[in-house]
Structures are given as structure tokens and as C-alpha cells.
């Protein structure tokens, strides 16, 4: 059966556009509109068939008919685009209504944490020494025995080198340890920096201690080192007194007791005046200090006849205990946010 010829008259094209408009306007959802588009703008739609029929017209009629078909197609496409925009706007409005948030409802409070007091104290200590013109220095936590012991004048048979005191890093014979103090940072500073040197190092250290009220196997140390011409114990004492006042207020006082450390000579233990000591006010041990041992200076290529230096070190956990009256060091490592909150985010 022969196909019926396509009517390309103005009326036929106008009727086709009207049918398209009715179909698109009648679509109430985007899915309905997509189906209508396939039917009225697809390859078998009346307008598409009219475009295909242009080739069968005489050349004299083809140009005029082509213009009229293109106008009809443009009008049909415009009708689709307009309805598509309307349906999309309705969909988006419905989504906004469905997903709206009632701002009058009570909020769900999220728990708020706080920076750990050791972190806060470390920043305070750093600020104190930077204000005095010192520099911050850092070093690795996994150290060689050369920096952790040898360069600090520890003899080969010193008990601190044993596995009873120091965490050894496998494999055996690697001569690597978890640093037992931040003193290796001082050696690296003397080897890498120009003199004079005034540095403070703050970081984690590791020893094989049992966790109890006054000890922890992982703790934080602050150590200071000054190497310059003409430094004496008086400079050391003045520095530590200033440090004590910055942490403990005007009542912060120190005293020295003779002691022995391999890397300082003479050496002393530093006591801090503790008004709230159990049993009444008194002195409690705070840290160690002394003049840098000449052997340590020589190991770093520094002439001890020209330069002298002093060093000191103390634990941040112990300092926090004294400063804030914390009886049990275990509270600092158990991660309970209730311990950190009283110190405040900016304490």
C-alpha cells in the first residue's frame, strides 16, 4: 500500500504545532513530557515526516516549504523547552518543600572537645622561650645511639643503654632506639647551626617505665641549650628562674642541688617551690641542668676554651602536675575528654 503524501500546507503545519503544544502542555511530569517529546519531536513525528518529504518537492517549491517546516519545528521545540522549564521548576520547588528544615526545632548538641593540656603547655613554653630570643628545634623520635648516647658522653656500659631502660628498635644491632630524651636535638643543632646557639626542643620521649601516678613510658620533654662565649651557671640560673615565673607565677622559685649527668659538668637537679605540696609547702624535683660537658662540645667540633654552654631539661607532664595540681599522671594519657575540657580550648 502506497504511503499517503505528506501535507506541507500552512494549515497542516499550524495544526501540527498546535497538537505539539497541547501534548506538551498536558504533560504533568517530566516523564510524561519525555514521552510526548518522542511522539511529537521524534523521527516519526508529523514535523519530522514533513522535513523528510521536502526532498520529493520540485526545486521551485522546496525552498519556501523548507522555511515553513523549519519555522514549525522551531515553534515545536520552543514549546517543549518552555514546558520543560516549568516542570523542572515545579520539581525543584517540591524538593525544597519536602527537604525543608524546620529552624524552630531544637538542635542536637554535638559534644565539643578541647585541645589536650600538654599541647597547650607545650605552646606556652615555646612562646616563653621565643619571647626571650631563643629558637625552636626539632629532631626524629627514632634516633641512633650515636646521637642519643655517644655524642652526649654516655659511656658504653651506662645502664641507660640497656633494654631495661631504653626501647630498642629491631633488628638487633641496628643501633637505633626510641629517643630517651630530646637531647639529641641539641647535638644536631650544634652540628648544623652557626654559633652562638640558643635553642629549645619540645617533643615526645620514650622510656621503659611502668604507667603509674608519677611515670609514663611516653612523655614530653622540654630541653634548652645555649652555647656562646662567656656563659656561666649564673646565666643558667637566670634562665630557669624566668621560665619558672612564666609557668608558676611570681611564687615560682628554683634551687639547684649537685648531681651527675654525663653531658653536663658541673650538673645539678632543679627543684621548684611547690606551695601546694602534700604535707605543706616545700621543694620538689623539677628537672636537671648544668654546664655543657667539654667532651660534648669537642664531639661537635667546638673549642671549649672559647665557648661554653648550659643545658636543662624537664618533663611537661611533671610541670603540668605542679602547675595545675594533677595528682595522677595517668589522667594525661587515657584520652578522657572530661580531663581536657576544664583547661579550655585557649587555656
Swiss-Prot record:
Binds 2 magnesium ions per tetramer. The keyword Ribonucleoprotein does not apply. CDD domains: PheRS_alpha_core. It holds the Pfam family tRNA-synt_2d. Its cofactor is Mg(2+). It catalyses: tRNA(Phe) + L-phenylalanine + ATP = L-phenylalanyl-tRNA(Phe) + AMP + diphosphate + H(+). GO terms for cellular component: cytoplasm. Tetramer of two alpha and two beta subunits. PANTHER family: PHENYLALANINE--TRNA LIGASE, MITOCHONDRIAL, PHENYLALANYL-TRNA SYNTHETASE. Belongs to the class-II aminoacyl-tRNA synthetase family. Phe-tRNA synthetase alpha subunit type 1 subfamily. This is Phenylalanine--tRNA ligase alpha subunit.
Amino acid at each position: 500500500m502506497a504511503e499517503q503524501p505528506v501535507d506541507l500546507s500552512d494549515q497542516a503545519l499550524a495544526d501540527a504545532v498546535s497538537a505539539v503544544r497541547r501534548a506538551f502542555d498536558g504533560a504533568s511530569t517530566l516523564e510524561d513530557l519525555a514521552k510526548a517529546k518522542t511522539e511529537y519531536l521524534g523521527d516519526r513525528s508529523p514535523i519530522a515526516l514533513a522535513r523528510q518529504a521536502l526532498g520529493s518537492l520540485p526545486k521551485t517549491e522546496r525552498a519556501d516549504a523548507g522555511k515553513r517546516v523549519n519555522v514549525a519545528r522551531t515553534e515545536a521545540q520552543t514549546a517543549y523547552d518552555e514546558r520543560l522549564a516549568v516542570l523542572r521548576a515545579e520539581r525543584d520547588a517540591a524538593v525544597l518543600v519536602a527537604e525543608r528544615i524546620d529552624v524552630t526545632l531544637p538542635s542536637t548538641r554535638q559534644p565539643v572537645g578541647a585541645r589536650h593540656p600538654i599541647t597547650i603547655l607545650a605552646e606556652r613554653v615555646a612562646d616563653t622561650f621565643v619571647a626571650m630570643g631563643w629558637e625552636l628545634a626539632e629532631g626524629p623520635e627514632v634516633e641512633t645511639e650515636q646521637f642519643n648516647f655517644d655524642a652526649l658522653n654516655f659511656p658504653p656500659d651506662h645502664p641507660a643503654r640497656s633494654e631495661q631502660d631504653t626501647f630498642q628498635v629491631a633488628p638487633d644491632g641496628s643501633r637505633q632506639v626510641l629517643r630517651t630524651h630530646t637531647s639529641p636535638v641539641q647535638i644536631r643543632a650544634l652540628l648544623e647551626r652557626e654559633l652562638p646557639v640558643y635553642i629549645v626542643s619540645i617533643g615526645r620521649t620514650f622510656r621503659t617505665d611502668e604507667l603509674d601516678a608519677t611515670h609514663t613510658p611516653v612523655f614530653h620533654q622540654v630541653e634548652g641549650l645555649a652555647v656562646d662565649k662567656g656563659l656561666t651557671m649564673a646565666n643558667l640560673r637566670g634562665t630557669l628562674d624566668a621560665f619558672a615565673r612564666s609557668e608558676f607565677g611570681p611564687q615560682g622559685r628554683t634551687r639547684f642541688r649537685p648531681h651527675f649527668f654525663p653531658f653536663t659538668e658541673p650538673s645539678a637537679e632543679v627543684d621548684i617551690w611547690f606551695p601546694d605540696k602534700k604535707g605543706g609547702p616545700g621543694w620538689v624535683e623539677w628537672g636537671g641542668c648544668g654546664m655543657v660537658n667539654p667532651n660534648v662540645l669537642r664531639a661537635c667540633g667546638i673549642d671549649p676554651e672559647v665557648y661554653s654552654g648550659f643545658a636543662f631539661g624537664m618533663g611537661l607532664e611533671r610541670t603540668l602536675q605542679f602547675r595545675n595540681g594533677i595528682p595522677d599522671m595517668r589522667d594525661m594519657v587515657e584520652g578522657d575528654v572530661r580531663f581536657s575540657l576544664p583547661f579550655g580550648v585557649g587555656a
